[in-house]
């Protein structure tokens, strides 16, 4: 909790302690922010959830495979693969949209999800393009802008139901 007499300073503190996001959808950060919102109770619940982590990852892996089987049948769409040398936690299901083959681009597909009231999001803005980091050293990352413009994260909650997946697939198949 933050207490202040100055409303502007209070607003600034809240802004900085909630990641300093200026655009929730595209993860735009014009200042360096922090994520200082974990209470002791939330920390205890998080530790208790760790016991379920292997089962959660297994469910998310299974759902990823189900999505992938269907999405592989749609020209111009593909879920990013997990390389053989990696062990993924399947946190996100990142959909690569090839506009030429699919017929519409990532942003138009995002609007279709929004119209269907299904949450989907672009991947995070590239750090080296964010205002606080523009003047910092960055490695050569020639492929990153290509992927940034073409990836959409689709619903991937551990509690995702078959019916919800079906709704996502209906949107993907309707172009």
Question: What is the predicted role of each segment?
Answer:
Residues 5-175:
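PLP-dependent aminotransferase class I/II
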Residues 1-2:
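Glycine-rich phosphate-binding loop of ATP-grasp-fold ATP-dependent ligases
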């Amino acid at each position: 909790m933050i207490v202040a007499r100055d409303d502007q300073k209070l607003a600034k503190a809240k802004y900085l302690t909630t990641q300093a996001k200026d655009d929730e959808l595209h993860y735009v950060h014009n200042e360096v922010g922090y994520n200082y919102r974990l209470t002791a109770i939330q920390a205890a619940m998080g530790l208790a959830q760790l016991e379920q982590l292997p089962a959660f990852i297994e469910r998310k892996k299974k759902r990823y495979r189900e999505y992938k089987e269907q999405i592989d049948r749609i020209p111009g769409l593909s879920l990013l693969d997990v390389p053989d040398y990696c062990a993924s936690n399947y946190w996100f299901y990142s959909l690569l949209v090839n506009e030429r083959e699919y017929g519409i681009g990532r942003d138009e597909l995002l609007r279709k999800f929004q119209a269907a009231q299904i949450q989907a999001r672009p991947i995070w803005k590239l750090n080296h393009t964010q205002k606080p980091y523009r003047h910092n050293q960055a490695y050569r990352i020639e492929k990153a802008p290509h992927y940034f413009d073409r990836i959409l994260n689709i619903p991937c909650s551990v509690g995702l139901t078959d019916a919800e997946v079906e709704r996502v697939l209906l949107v993907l198949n309707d172009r």
